[in-house]
Amino acid sequence: PYIPGRDFSGVVSALGAGVTDLKVGDEVFGVCDVGQEQAYAEKIAIKASIVAKKPPQLSHADAAALALIGLTALVSVEDTLKLKRDETIFISGGAGGVASYAVQLSKHIGARVITSASKANHDYVRSLGADEAIDYNAVDVAKAVSGCDAAFDTVGGNVTQQAFAVLKPGGRAAFIGSGAKAPEP
């Protein structure tokens, strides 16, 4: 039977031949390869190369939640958008899972970060490093923000249009989830 799930965290119970950087009893976490989803099983056999030691301050639940959303943010910001220091990025839904990591990563890179969030989440997204928080319930983001080097839409739907609208000519955009149709050039 098919066993779903990509994010995992657990304790190493056995090792394959040639594995030297892990030992039985190590607490680990990671993301199953595409096509190898099985993380919701009680035990999984997984390549050691995609396993990381779990930081002791994280619970297993927190570590499992970290892997795929963190990886999604990393690939989107660094690989797809190729965000650089001193660039400006707009991130939709800054208080969400992937977006909250993207805000922190973008700030770490040295970018100026603008994000949309409900008013109740403005202090939170600022604590993550956002330079500017836009209340999407009170402001038309597409009119309030412009000239961004990059946009990362983590919400989808009609919000996708905002990502295109905030970009400067030649700006870069990345999207996760399902979005609205791209505007005609």
Which sequence ranges carry the predicted segments?
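Terminal helix/beta-alpha structural elements that buttress the NAD(P)+-binding lobe
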Residues: 1-185
